[in-house]
Amino acid sequence: MNVAIVGATGYGGIQAVNLLKKNKNYKISFLGGNKTSGSKWNDNFPFIYLDNDPYVEEISVDNISKNSDVALLCLPNGLSSTLTRKLLERGLKVIDLSADYRYKSLDEWKKVYSKEAAIYKRNDDDLCKEAVYGLPEINKEAISKGRLIACPGCYPTSALIPLAPYLSQGIIENEGIVIDSKSGTSGGGREPNQKLLLSECGEGLSAYGLINHRHTSEIEQVASLISGNKIELLFTPHLVPIPRGMHSTIYGRLRDPGLTSDDCRILLDNYYRNFKNIKVLPVDTFPSTKWVKNTNQIFLSVKVDIRNGRIIILSAIDNLLKGQTGQAIQNLNIMSGFSMDEGLELTNNYP
C-alpha cells in the first residue's frame, strides 16, 4: 500500500517516515513539505536515512494522489481541510493528525479553533459528521470501515484511555472529573516559539490554557459519548522541560465508595486485556514518561483513596507516538486489515 506523508518535515511527519520506512506492508509514495520542497530528504534528515533519497515535493492534491492509496496529513489545524475532500474524491483514504475533523459539528470546530476558522473558510460539515474518531482501543470497528480518520489529540489520548473503562460502566460519577496533565516541549510543534526556548522553559514547570484549552472540549465530547451522559470536566495542562513525553493524573468520585484499588485495577486490566500496547501496572506502581519514551505504549495505574471514595488514575505516553503518529499508524493498520500493532513493536531505550 502506497502512503503519502503530507507535512513530512514536521515532528509528526518525521515520526511517520521513521515508522513506515521499516514497515514491509507500506511504501512511502510521497513526501510533502512546502518550505523544503525541491530538496533531497537525506540532506534534511540524514539521521532518518532513506535508501532512495527522494525529493521533498510541493504539497498539492495532484502530487499527493498521483501514486498514493492513503494520505497521512501531518499539517497545522485548518490546512488539512483544504485538501481532504479532493483527496477523498480521488479515491484516497485520509488519516488526519490535525483537529480539523475531531468534532462532529463544523460549528463546534469554528468556535474552538476560531483563529484558524478566520483563515480557512470551511464548508465541509458533512465530512465532520462522517469522520471517525481514531482512538483505536475504543473505535476499532468504525475505523476499519472508515475512509476519513481524525486522529485524537495527545492530551485527549492520555485522558480518554484511562477514563473509558470507568465512564462506560458507570463506575465513576459524571461530575467532578479533574485532569492534570504534563507535556514535553515537542507537543508545541517544530515551528519557532518563544515559550519553548530552552532559556524560557528549561528548569521550570508552568501551567497554561486553564479552562479554555482546546483539548478540553475534545475530551468532553468523546467522554460524553463513552458515558452516554453529558460530561463537563476540569483540564489543566502543564509544560515540562523534556523533549517528549506526557503524563496525566485524573481524579474522579466513585459511585460505590466501597471499591478498592485492587477492584479498580482488575476492571482496568480486564477492559484492556486484548491490547498489547496498554500496560496496566500493579497497585502502588505509578507510570513514568521514561518508561514509554520512543514507544507506542501507554502505561496505566489506579489508586483509590478509601477515606473519601475518590479514584486517581494515571497514564504515561510518548506524545509524538501514542499521542500522535504511532496512533495514526495504528489506524492505518486497522484500515488496511493488518494487526493494530504491526510495525509498532518499539522498545524503550531506558534510561
From Swiss-Prot:
The active site is at C154. It catalyses: N-acetyl-L-glutamate 5-semialdehyde + phosphate + NADP(+) = N-acetyl-L-glutamyl 5-phosphate + NADPH + H(+). One of its GO terms (biological process) is L-arginine biosynthetic process. Its EC number is 1.2.1.38. It comes from the Bacteria. One of its GO terms (molecular function) is NAD binding. Keywords: Amino-acid biosynthesis, Arginine biosynthesis, Cytoplasm, NADP, Oxidoreductase. Pathway: Amino-acid biosynthesis; L-arginine biosynthesis; N(2)-acetyl-L-ornithine from L-glutamate: step 3/4. It is an enzyme of class 1 (oxidoreductase). Gene3D superfamilies: Dihydrodipicolinate Reductase, domain 2, NAD(P)-binding Rossmann-like Domain. HAMAP family: ArgC_type1 (MF_00150). Belongs to the NAGSA dehydrogenase family. Type 1 subfamily. Catalyzes the NADPH-dependent reduction of N-acetyl-5-glutamyl phosphate to yield N-acetyl-L-glutamate 5-semialdehyde. This is N-acetyl-gamma-glutamyl-phosphate reductase. It comes from Prochlorococcus marinus (strain MIT 9215). The gene is argC.
